[in-house]
UniProtKB/Swiss-Prot annotation:
The keyword Protein biosynthesis does not apply. It is found in: Cell inner membrane. It comes from Pectobacterium atrosepticum (strain SCRI 1043 / ATCC BAA-672) (Erwinia carotovora subsp. atroseptica). Its main location: membrane. This is Lysophospholipid transporter LplT.
Length: 407
């Protein structure tokens, strides 16, 4: 008796296409708005030390809301959660456009982004099947990086022309993302009916943290992704000091273009991971993580712009190959235990905590007068050693499990 198999759903289904379009314009708005708002506060003669507070408010929203946004993503249809989050982003952009406090407006965008993140990743596990999840993550990361590239450039260029035109374009981008969210078919909530008491939600969140930490695969993903994004933000600031020191170039464009090369590489690496890595062999990404640290050391010693561009593309490619499978792994493990939304919320807490920690350490060594070359070498060596230790611990754990099974 022959069995009929259900035809496979294409990767770029209506739902997936809507999610990717919404993600691109939402991330485009986030990045363009940052640079447009920086230009605005300069025009309004805010002190220079106030500029980092834009990003701090944005990141702080992720950390403060981490215990709650995962449950929000799992308690409602994720497409509707994404729509609500983009509405908050649109409100923040409009607040800045009409002359409201830019720090308050961008923090409101951060609140929207914090609510958006668990839903945008969690929905991938609901609209794809099996190994399509890794490919879907590759599309999501590629869309995000493309938005970072185009949004950052657009925000800066448009702000030089007209700041309020730049801010208006950001609001339009959020509006387009909101429209794309409306095209996502209604999906059932993953975990409806959970209690809405802040203390219980916080307790549930930290319980999810413990559950994921005890899961070896989830722990690998949490550590790896937190290290990657913490290092990525630190590298962005490192480049600003490295360019004039190593290349003798003092303009503002060169560090931006070098950062863009990393983003281009991440897109390439994400595509490679989608083709070569599955959930069954996800640890294949670890050598790429180790090589990130090695390439940072080699890059720091360069004095040629062309070699710098080439190495940063390679660095980004290694990063994309490293991060995409780890994201997919956490979604899979989280979906099976605490819910994909809660898993991504825990991941956001780890990543943003790592960003604050690494930037704090970076600021400290700069203040102590350590040279940028020494910082770059030390940064690369420490990152490579950390990944090597993580890799070694996984190998030892696997060997112990085999030994126990043999007995």
């Amino acid at each position: 008796m022959s069995q009929q198999t259900e035809p496979a759903t294409p990767l770029l289904s209506r739902s997936m296409s809507a999610v990717i379009i919404a993600q691109f314009f939402s991330a485009f708005g986030d990045n363009a708005l940052l640079f447009a708002t920086l230009a605005l506060i300069k025009q309004l003669v805010y002190p220079d030390w106030s500029q980092p507070f834009l990003q701090m408010g944005f990141v702080a929203a992720y950390i403060v809301l981490a215990p709650f946004v995962g449950q929000i993503a799992d308690s409602f249809a994720k497409g509707r959660v994404m729509m609500f989050a983009n509405t908050l982003k649109l409100a923040g952009a409009l607040l800045i456009c009409v002359g409201g406090n830019p720090f308050l407006g961008y923090t409101l965008v951060g609140i929207g982004a914090a609510a958006y993140s668990p839903a945008k990743y969690g929905i991938l596990g609901e609209i794809t099947r099996g190994d399509q999840l890794v490919k879907a993550n590759g599309l999501m990361e590629a869309s995000t990086i493309a938005a970072i590239l185009t949004g950052s450039v657009a925000g800066g260029v448009l702000a030089d022309w007209n700041i309020y035109a730049a801010l208006s374009i950001c609001a339009v981008a959020y509006g387009v993302a909101l429209g794309a969210n409306m095209l996502i078919p209604h999906l059932n909530a993953a975990r409806p009916g959970q209690p809405w008491h802040p203390v219980q939600m916080a307790s549930s969140f930290f319980s999810a943290c413990r559950v994921l930490w005890r899961d070896g695969d989830a722990r690998l993903s949490l550590i790896g992704t937190s290290m990657f994004w913490g290092a990525g933000v630190t590298l962005r600031f490192l480049l600003v000091l490295w360019v004039p020191h190593a290349l003798g170039i003092t303009d503002n464009a060169t560090p931006t273009l070098l950062n863009a090369m990393v983003a281009v590489g991440i897109v390439l690496g994400a595509g490679g991971a989608a083709r070569l890595v599955t959930l069954d062999n996800v640890r294949r990404c670890l050598p790429a993580g180790f090589l990130i640290g090695v390439v940072v050391v080699i890059f720091t010693l360069q004095h040629n712009l062309l070699s710098a561009y080439s190495l940063l593309i390679l660095l980004g490619a290694l990063g994309g190959f490293f991060i995409v499978p780890l994201n997919a792994l956490l979604q899979e493990r989280g979906k099976a235990s605490v819910g994909a939304g809660n898993a991504i919320a825990v991941q956001n807490l780890g990543e943003n905590g790592a960003m604050l920690l690494m930037l704090g350490l970076y600021s400290l060594v700069v203040k102590l007068g350590v040279s940028v070359i020494a910082i770059g070498i030390g940064f690369g060596v420490l990152f490579a050693l950390a990944i090597a230790l993580l890799w070694a611990s996984l190998i030892l754990t696997k060997r112990r499990a085999r030994s126990a099974g043999a007995k």
